[in-house]
Amino acid sequence: MEKIEKRTDYCGNITEKYIGQDVNLYGWVQRVRNLGNLVFIDLRDREGLVQIVVNKDSGKKLMDIADSLGNEYVVQVKGKVVKRSEVNPDMKTGQVEVDATEIIILNKAKNPPFEIKDGIEVSEQTRLKYRYLDLRRPEVQQAIILRSKILRATHEFFDENGFIDIETPILGKSSPEGARDYLVPSRIYPGSFYALPQSPQLFKQLLMGAGFDKYYQLARCFRDEDLRGDRQPEFTQIDMEMSFADEETIQSYTEGLLKKIMKDVKGIDLKTPIKRITWTDSMNKYGCDKPDTRYGMLIHDLSPIFKDSDFKVFSGAIADGGFVKGIAVKNGAKEYSRKKIDKKADFIKRFHAKGLAWVKFEDGEFSGPVARFLTDENKEALKKEFDLEGGELVVFVADKWKVCCDSLDHLRREFAKETGIIPKGVYDFVWVVDWPLFEYDEGLGRWVAAHHPFTMPDDEGVKLLTTEPHKAHARSYDIVMNGDEMGGGSIRIHKRSIQENMFKALGFTKKRAYEQFGYLMDALDMGFPPHAGLAIGLDRFAMMLADKDNIRDVSAFPKNASASEPMMHAPAPVADQQLADLGIEVEEKYQDSVKATEERLEKMAAEDAAENSTWDK
């Protein structure tokens, strides 16, 4: 039986303080270099690399073992730490090396399908299929460790501030609102299903009614929706709720949490209070409700300048109730040719813009397609509006308010990336407040809740719920960082009458409202306190702090872009008996696909066993 002796320290921590000491190390062989009389071994663990040295004076047995090592072998090394003759400044342990006296091979390794090092080019499918190997790479490990640091800081903050960590159920009831639920069939109640939670929203509100006052949870959530780079079917929320709290209270605690996380994880002193911007100002200045406030290039409403313009594209749009909005790109006059600008015009068509007008301002003169329509008054107004100094490209969109906002938001982000004005290593937070209670969903053709149907309207909004609900404003707030929504929250409805009016405004019938949420409305009649809360998306937050482009890079075992897991081959067909126990039968139109999947998985397993198994040896 292998005896595992106590490790002295991690490989990456063997620095000058250990010189002259005997150490016992464990790790993976990163590289072996045999120079004849000397063998150098780079030994790796989660903290980094240390160089192991074996020379001919160590004896033939040790030299033979060292020479037999392959990449990714798991070994135990004993030896003395000595000062290196040549320092390697690129390694944390570059001042020292370990003069080995014993090497024990704990396990051998086949040649991996890709090299275990940073900066390799390998497909995501291969990385996920061999995720246990991918996770050995330092940059991947550091992203997972960073996520762990966020979790630790979160637990510490909430514990220090009197919050109670309460787990809410994973198996709950389906609600057809929002994204699709993941359903779990019940064997005990055939034909009935649990739903995995999209959030613990109602449970945490009920906990406030139960008198717990301060709740938090690192909540696992599930949504069956189309995937993007920043989405996974399962994800984690930093979830909090408080009784007897207003917007400022929740925002203050959130800022305290963010301040601790930024300090503990990134070593950054976050300045608080975090600035606020209203939803309306955010839309008008940045074109979106997730403003990237790291740079300028703000959107300007130019409608007053062009309402009487001879350029009918502008004046006509304004006359039809639309707007003319624009942005100025510094040094854009030389950077962007007509061909490049035409590509931008094509780009914004996906946001329903009809076109892109533009002028350049150079050497005190305007040029470009729109320049001939500009009066002297227009020119002076534009120079003043944008504070033009020379060399700018000014682009315009004339359309409905929402189209102008969407188009210029995406253009602004594109121009910022291309012109290099986004500062590196900056984490800029902003609160977006004073949201509309409802937003119009073009696809559904009706008004829907801007956040969720349990959000409290402001005082005027409570009155508008029964008359003009689409004009109501919400007591809600989102926290945004670098143009990405980190989280959001609101004051919650705590009275039955307001909750019923909210459901009415959303088009619920009484029957539907009480079938889905009767328990909540009954609870609101049982002495429910005013309460509020917020949730932060841990995965997205970790992704941004780790400077990654994909949430999959900060999840240990993520799904791919098709919501499947190539290593375990999930999802996969199950045995007929399992389906029969649940009263489920696969429709005939899907049976060929299921059979093909079963055959493919069986073939892969058989090939794996034939090539690699020691079963019959």
Where are these regions (language model features)?
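Class II aminoacyl-tRNA synthetase catalytic cores and aaRS-like
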Residues: M1-K617
